Amino acid sequence: MVFRSGEGHSLQWPGPEGGTGCTGPQSMLRATLLLVSLLWGARGTPSASLSPALGHPMPLTRGRYLSIGDGSVMEFEFPEESEGIIVITSQYPGQGNGTGPSPMLRVTSLDPEVLAIKNVSSIALGSGGSFVVSIRSGLPGIAPLHIQLTDPREAPPRLIEERRDFCIKVSPAEDTPITLGTDLVHFSENPILYLLLPLIFVNKCSFGCKVELEVLKGLLQNPQPMLLGLLGQFLVMPFYAFLMAKVFMLPKALALGLIITCSSPGGGGSYLFSLLLGGDVTLAISMTFISTVAATGFLPLSSAIYSRLLSIHETLHVPVSKILGTLLFIAIPIAAGVVIKSKLPKFSQLLLHVIKPFSFVLLLGGLFLAYRMGVFILAGVRLPIVLVGFTVPLVGLLVGYGLATCLKLPVAQRRTVSIEVGVQNSLLALAMLQLSLRRLQADYASQAPFLVALSGTSEMLALVIGHFIYSSVCAVP
C-alpha cells in the first residue's frame, strides 16, 4: 500500500536501527493506516509499456512472505516531489510473537533520483507483521525496488526472501509552462526558437552545397580519415561516456544525456576550426556530412546498447524513434544540398549567397536561446557532470589526433580528424533530449550536452588563440 503524506509534511518513522516507534497520536494514526491498508489492499496501475511481470496482475506464489496490498499489483503510482509511505506486509511466521529479534527488511531504490528511501520501521501484528517504508519522490520515472527480508538471529543474517518485481512509477506534473519569475518562460516555448527553425533547415541545406563530390569520391578510394573519424565518434567516445557514467555514478537521466552527446556526429563549426587551425577544410566538411548521415544508424544503436548496460531502460524510455527523427531533420537538408550542388550548381551558389546575411541572425538567436537555456538547464548542476563535460572535448581531440598519428596521416588531416572527433554536435544532442523526454527529465539530461558545448567552444577558442600566438612567434604555417 502506498500513501502520500500531506503537502509540505512527511510522516516520520524510526528506521530499523532506530527507536521502538512513536507514541501518542502518531502511533494511533500509524496503526489506523496500517489496518486500512491490510483490509483494503493497494491501488496500483499496471503499465502496458512494462514487461508482463510488471504490467499484469500476478498471484502471490507459494512460499512468498512479502507483499504490497493483496500482492496482485506490481507497479504503484506516486506523484513527483512528494513524501509518503509504503506498507509492506510480511507473512513470515514468528515475526509477531515477540520471542526474539524480528526479521529485518531492507528496501533499496534502484534509481534514487526518481525515488529515495528515507527509512524503514516494523510493526508486529498477530502471527506476522508489516513494515512501513518512508519514501520521497523526485524526478518522474520508474524506480524498481530491491526488497530483502533477513533473519538477524543467525550470523551472518540469513536471507529469507528477496523481491525485485515491485516498482514505483513517479508520475510527472502536468507540463504547464514553468516560470522563474514574472516574465521568464521555458525556452522551448520561446517564439524565437520557432522563427529560427526554417533558417536552420536552409542553413543545413547550404552546408550540403559546400560538400565537394570529388572529395567524397576521394574518401571512398582512401577512406582512412573517414574511418578514423567514425571510429572515434561512434565507438571510442560513447565508450568513454559509459566509463564516466560508471565512475562518477551519474543519475540515469544524466547518463543518457552524456551517452547521446558522445554518440553525436561532428558539427558545432568543426570545419571553421579546421580552417583556423590549419586543417583540411574540404575534408572537414565531407567528414561532417558523412558522420551526420552515419549517425542516423550509429547514434540510436549506441544509445540503445549503453542504456541497457547502464540499466537506463529500467527507469527511462529511450526514445529511439524520436532520436532518429531529429537526426533526419538535420541529415535530409544536408543531403538535399549535396544533390542541389550536383544537379543545379547555379542554384546552389545562389543559396550560399542568400544564407550569408542570415548566418548573423542565427548566431544572435543562438546566443539568446543559449542564455535562456542555461537559466533552466544549469539550475542545480553538480560538480561531477561539470568535470565530465569539461573532459569530453579534450578526450575527443586527443583520441582523434592519436588515431590519425598512428596511421601517419598528413599533419593537416591529423588536425581535421582530431577536431571532427573532439567537436561534436552537442546542440543536436540537446535538441534530441528536449524533443524526446518530458520537460523535467529533458532539462536534467540536457545538462550534459549543454556543458559539453560550453566546454568545447571555450577549449577550441583557447586552441585557436594559442595557435595564432605560436604561429606568429615561431613562424609555423
Curated annotation (Swiss-Prot):
It is a multi-pass membrane protein. One of its GO terms (biological process) is response to retinoic acid. Disulfide bonds: none annotated. InterPro entries: BilAc:Na_symport/Acr3, Bilac:Na_transpt, Na+/solute_symporter_sf. The chain crosses the membrane at residues 225-245, 253-273, 281-301, 320-340, 361-381, 383-403, 417-437, 450-470. Residues 1-21 are annotated as: Disordered. Keywords: Membrane, Symport, Transmembrane, Transmembrane helix, Transport. It is found in: Membrane. Gene3D superfamilies: 1.20.1530.20. One of its GO terms (cellular component) is membrane. GO terms for molecular function: bile acid:sodium symporter activity. Belongs to the bile acid:sodium symporter (BASS) (TC 2.A.28) family. The ubiquitous expression and the conservation of the sequence in distant animal species suggest that the gene codes for a protein with housekeeping functions. PANTHER family: P3 PROTEIN (PTHR10361:SF3), SODIUM-BILE ACID COTRANSPORTER (PTHR10361). This is P3 protein. It comes from Bos taurus. The gene is SLC10A3.
